[in-house]
Each structure stands twice: as structure tokens, then as C-alpha cells.
Design a protein with these regions (language model features):
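Alpha-helical transmembrane segments and their immediate interhelical/interface regions
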Residues: 74-95, 147-178, 293, 346-353
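Alpha-helical transmembrane segments of multi-pass inner-membrane proteins
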Residues: 10-18, 22-23, 28-29, 40-61, ...
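Membrane-interface catalytic loops of GT-C/OST-like multi-pass glycosylation enzymes that act
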Residues: 150-155, 244, 288-295, 410-414, ...
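N-terminal hydrophobic segments of proteins, predominantly signal-anchor/transmembrane helices
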Residues: 54-75, 99-164
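Juxtamembrane membrane-water interface segments that cap and precede transmembrane helices
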Residues: 73-88, 148, 223-239, 373, ...
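TM-adjacent membrane-interface loops and short helices in multi-pass inner/ER membrane proteins
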Residues: 208, 345-349, 353-409, 416, ...
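Membrane-interface capping segments at transmembrane-helix boundaries
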Residues: 497-505
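Helix-to-loop transition at the C-terminal end of transmembrane segments
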Residues: 67-74, 145-147, 200-214, 338-349
Length: 506
């Protein structure tokens, strides 16, 4: 019997080995060494959360060399007698970083799907963003300049590759399904906002502006007998390239900071978020552009409305009072900067300085034949270009075709019109469908927050996305700002990423 039991156990082991033969595992590994197949749900949640943190840190750090190399010469373009500066090389690192973190984001999404952190069967509506990506490829291929539409043009760098990076960041955000991981990600995002705000404030103070690099320290003002003339203007940009990018980023992050300050249970986090919010409020005002004021105002007003309704459900008026105080403090900061002449709107000068001086891709401004406000003027140009390229657009970032249509600049400073003119009516319509689906999810998140069904992070990401969409009417997408929106949008979708699993557990 002893020997019989021994041979029977050996036969069983042999049978088990045989049944595992022929199975494919990730990276060609065996089942025991396949760390992804053996990963627990908690480990998968940690992987997704940690990667999203790494992604936002990379997006923050990668822009810094572009600033500190702006005056370092490395050669001469003799064909046009132009000095070459090292920052022209580093700007490509930013778009490359967006592509890289987006590509890895897709991989993280696939892993999350394997580990049931994202249930594709419960998210069939993902077919819409997939269609947007595939049709964007067609728009790129039909462009008059496929190379530019694929890689992007110079410092804009918003070609097809960057678009893929954006959607990869959306996918990465969608995988962060554990609420504690969302809170930790929020901590890093708010920290980045505070960092950019501090840099922006230092750029706007004459005494410190001398040592903090900035592309908007001097604004192009025209030509004279001696050549080009500039005026000193201390404008906040952070390390985000332009005041418009700073406005977009701080709009998104202010929503995280304000909601975390109002509703989180930890006192230390409340204090950190509150201080960060004050810094971001000041820096946003010092950006001196309409979308900064519009986005910031939307954050406070929407959060105040939510807090008022929440106080009725929870019978706790502390968040509403705290939000009202924050709103008053923000008004005080604005009044102080306005009284000291530090606040002024310089949208038109900034727009043309950015395109003419920083990017060298357009003329010096519009003619003197009109007194129309700059935004409707640019919107008219954008709509005309869209009408001439109605179905598939000009192709992503294809500035050449835009200029051929008579536009004075390659952007309309309205993200929706920019999308319509660059990628056409079909992709525009599908993107609107995607945004409507996202807004519906946001409404459900806020409704759930009112009834304590989900945490404040759902309210924060909803406010962040909505306020970004509001300021986008006066702004442009950018490799330094748009990634934060796409991560926030992914976080909105993360709350329904595992819908069926949640139902089974309940």
C-alpha cells in the first residue's frame, strides 16, 4: 500500500504537469513565475494607483528642462541665419513623455482588465473613444501633410501620436478603482498644482522673476526702427509653457484641492489642500487670461452649489460654510491683486507672443481693420477652416492647411472649434457623445456623493472635468495641460469600471 500510494501520487503530479503544458503565459513565463496571473486584487489596485502617480510626476518633471535651456545655444541654422537653442530639443521630450506614459497606460489597462479591475462587458460604451481614435487615424492619413499630422508640429506637438497618449492616460485613470488609491493620486496632483502655482507666483514678482525662467517675461509689442520691441510683463506660466496651459491645469487641480479640503476626514490633508488652493488661486489670477478666471470661478461656484445641496442632505453645514469662506478668500485675493495693478487681462498679446515669438509659426497679430474681440475673431477663422474641411478636418496639428484657409493663427482658442477644424465633423460628434456620457457619469457620482454612496473623490473629479470643459471655450489643448484633463476623465469612468463585480459583492 505504501509503494502504491507513492506511485499514485507521482502519477497525479505527472497528470497535473501534463494538463498545464501548452498553456500560454505572459512574457513566455511559467505559471508560478507569472507575476501578473498570480497578482491579487489588492496588488492590482496598487499597481494601477502607483502607475497613475508615476505618470503625473513624469508629466510635471519633464517640462522643467524646457525652461532652463531656453538661453543655451547649441548651433546655427545657416539656411535662415537663426541661432538654435537647446530648448528646441527638449520640447520634443514633453510630447514623447505623453506618448510613453500613455502607451504604458494602455498596458496597465489591459492588466487591470485581466485582474477584473476593469470589466469591459460593463463598459461597452468604450467603443466610442475607440472609434474616435481609429477615425483620428483616418483624419491623419487624409491630411495634406501626413508627417506633421502624425508627429505634430514643432512645440505644439499634438499630432496623432500625442492623441494616442491622451487616450492612454484616460485608460490609466480608469484603472484606479480603489478609493484609497484615488485619494493618494489626488495628493500628488494637488502637490503638483501647488508647485506650479509657486513657480507662477515667483514668475509674476519682479524681484524673483529675474531668476525664475519664463517665456512670458517680456511680451512682443511690435516693430520699431531698431527691430522688434518688447514690454516687460510679469505673467505666471508655471513650468507649463504658457499662461493658458497654467489656467487649464490649475482649473482641474483646484477642484481636487477644494473638494478635498471640504470633505476629507484628515486634518493634515485639509490644511495641505487649503494652502495649495490659496496658492493656485493667486497663480491663476496672475496668468492674466480669461480661461484662468473663468475656470477658477467655475470651480468655486460649482463646489459651493454642491456643498449647499449636500448640507441639506447631511444636515451638516460645515462644508458649505468652509466653501463660502474659501470663495470669499479667493475674492479677497483677486481684489488685492486687482488693487495693486497685478491683475490685467492680456489674452490677445499673450496669444500672439506665444505663436510669433515662442513658436515662430504665425504673423505678429491681426490687422487694424477691426476692433472685434480677439476670441470671436479667431473663432470665425476656425469655423471657416472647419467648413472647408468639414468631414475629416485638416488632420491633427496640420497648421499648413489652416493657414492656407486664411487663418491668422493655427489655433482658434476654443477647443471645440479646434477639434472640428482639425479632425472633422464625424470625430467632433463622437467626442461630444463621449463627453455627454462622461457628464452623465459625473451627475451620478455627485448624486451618489449626496447620499454618501461614494467619497469626495467622485465629486472632485466631476467638478474638475466640468470646469475644464467650461474654460475650454477660451483655451486650447496642450501637451502640458490636456493630460491632466484626460486622467481626471478616466477617474470619472473608474467608478463604473467594475460595476458587475460590485453588484456581485453586494
Amino acid at each position: 500500500m505504501l509503494f502504491g500510494g507513492f506511485f499514485m501520487s507521482k502519477a497525479k503530479e505527472k497528470k497535473e504537469v501534463t494538463t498545464n503544458q501548452g498553456k500560454k503565459h505572459l512574457f513566455g513565463s511559467s505559471e508560478k513565475s507569472d507575476f501578473i496571473l498570480n497578482m491579487s486584487a489588492e496588488s492590482a489596485q496598487k499597481l494601477c494607483g502607483v502607475y497613475s502617480i508615476i505618470a503625473v510626476l513624469v508629466l510635471c518633471v519633464i517640462t522643467i528642462p524646457y525652461y532652463f535651456t531656453q538661453n543655451i545655444k547649441y548651433g546655427m541654422d545657416e539656411s535662415v541665419n537663426r541661432t538654435l537653442y537647446l530648448n528646441e530639443k527638449f520640447i520634443f521630450f514633453i510630447s514623447a513623455a505623453v506618448l510613453a506614459v500613455g502607451f504604458v497606460g494602455f498596458i496597465i489597462f489591459l492588466i487591470a482588465n485581466m485582474k477584473k479591475q476593469v470589466e469591459l462587458k460593463d463598459n461597452k460604451s468604450l467603443i466610442v473613444p475607440l472609434a474616435v481614435v481609429l477615425l483620428s487615424v483616418i483624419s491623419c492619413l487624409l491630411s495634406a501633410d501626413i508627417f506633421t499630422s502624425f508627429y505634430g508640429y514643432l512645440d505644439r506637438s499634438e499630432g496623432m501620436l500625442t492623441i494616442l497618449g491622451y487616450w492612454g492616460l484616460f485608460a490609466a485613470g480608469m484603472t484606479v478603482t480603489a478609493d484609497d488609491r484615488r485619494v493618494k493620486l489626488s495628493d500628488f496632483i494637488v502637490g503638483i498644482g501647488a508647485f506650479e502655482a509657486i513657480v507662477g507666483i515667483l514668475q509674476a514678482i519682479p524681484a524673483t522673476a529675474k531668476i525664475v525662467p519664463n517665456y512670458f517675461k517680456e511680451i512682443f509689442s511690435g516693430f520699431s526702427s531698431g527691430g522688434m520691441t518688447y514690454t516687460k510683463e510679469y505673467i505666471a506660466t508655471g513650468f507649463l509653457c504658457t499662461p493658458f496651459a497654467l489656467a487649464a491645469v490649475l482649473t482641474v487641480i483646484s477642484a481636487f484641492a477644494l473638494n478635498g479640503m471640504l470633505y476629507d476626514d484628515k486634518k493634515a490633508r485639509k490644511i495641505f489642500y487649503g494652502i495649495s488652493l490659496a496658492l493656485m488661486t493667486a497663480a491663476d489670477i496672475l496668468a492674466c487670461v480669461i480661461p484662468a478666471i473663468l475656470g477658477l470661478g467655475a470651480v468655486y461656484v460649482i463646489s459651493l452649489i454642491i456643498a449647499a445641496v449636500k448640507s441639506g442632505f447631511a444636515k451638516d453645514k460645515k462644508p458649505f460654510i468652509a466653501c463660502l469662506v474659501a470663495f470669499i478668500v479667493a475674492g479677497g485675493i483677486f481684489a488685492g491683486l486687482f488693487a495693486s495693478n497685478e491683475f490685467r487681462l492680456m489674452d490677445e498679446k499673450i496669444i500672439f507672443h506665444d505663436s510669433f515669438d515662442r513658436l515662430s509659426i504665425t504673423g505678429t497679430g491681426r490687422g487694424d481693420d477691426t476692433e472685434q474681440w480677439i476670441y470671436p475673431y479667431l473663432w470665425d477663422d476656425g469655423m471657416y477652416t472647419a467648413e472647408q474641411n468639414l468631414i475629416w478636418g485638416t488632420g491633427p496639428d496640420n497648421w499648413g492647411t489652416i493657414f492656407e484657409s486664411g487663418a491668422i493663427i493655427d489655433r482658434s482658442y476654443n477647443e471645440y472649434i479646434d477639434l472640428l477644424q482639425s479632425r472633422g465633423l464625424i470625430i467632433f460628434a463622437l467626442t461630444i457623445v463621449f463627453l455627454i456620457m462622461t457628464i452623465v457619469k459625473m451627475c451620478k457620482l455627485v448624486a451618489g456623493f449626496m447620499k454618501d454612496k461614494n467619497s469626495w473623490t467622485g465629486c472632485a473629479v466631476s467638478a474638475a472635468v466640468l470646469c475644464y470643459l467650461i474654460q475650454a471655450f477660451f483655451n486650447i489643448s496642450s501637451v502640458t495641460s490636456s493630460p491632466y484633463f484626460w486622467i481626471a476623465a478616466g477617474l470619472v469612468w473608474s467608478f463604473t469600471a467594475v460595476k458587475s463585480s460590485a453588484k456581485k459583492k453586494s
